[in-house]
Amino acid sequence: TIINVKCTSPKQCLPPCKEIYGRHAGAKCMNGKCHCSKI
């Protein structure tokens, strides 16, 4: 899932991804946007 959060590193994406998927969230930063996934 691409979320509308700008990022330069995956660490910035983890908090918003955890809000969506809980503690089993995976976060990636691609093309300046956060991509969340459920692990």
Curated annotation (Swiss-Prot):
PROSITE patterns the record matches: SCORP_SHORT_TOXIN
Which residues are marked as site: Basic residue of the functional dyad? Answer: K28
What disulfide bonds does the UniProt entry report for this chain?
Answer: C7-C29, C13-C34, C17-C36
User: One GO MF term, please?
Assistant: ion channel inhibitor activity
Protein origin, superkingdom? Eukaryota
Which residues does this entry mark as bearing Isoleucine amide? I39
Q: What tissue specificity is annotated for this entry? A: Expressed by the venom gland.
Where does this protein chiefly localize? secreted
Localization of this protein = Secreted
Q: Write out the entry's keywords from A to Z.
A: Amidation, Disulfide bond, Ion channel impairing toxin, Neurotoxin, Potassium channel impairing toxin, Secreted, Toxin, Voltage-gated potassium channel impairing toxin
One Gene Ontology cellular component: extracellular region
Pfam families noted in UniProt: Toxin_2
Function summary: Weakly blocks Kv1.3/KCNA3 voltage-gated potassium channels (Kd is estimated to be 69 nM).
Q: Fill in the domain comment.
A: Has the structural arrangement of an alpha-helix connected to a beta-sheet by disulfide bonds (CSalpha/beta).
What family is this? Belongs to the short scorpion toxin superfamily. Potassium channel inhibitor family. Alpha-KTx 02 subfamily.
Q: What is this protein called?
A: Potassium channel toxin alpha-KTx 2.12
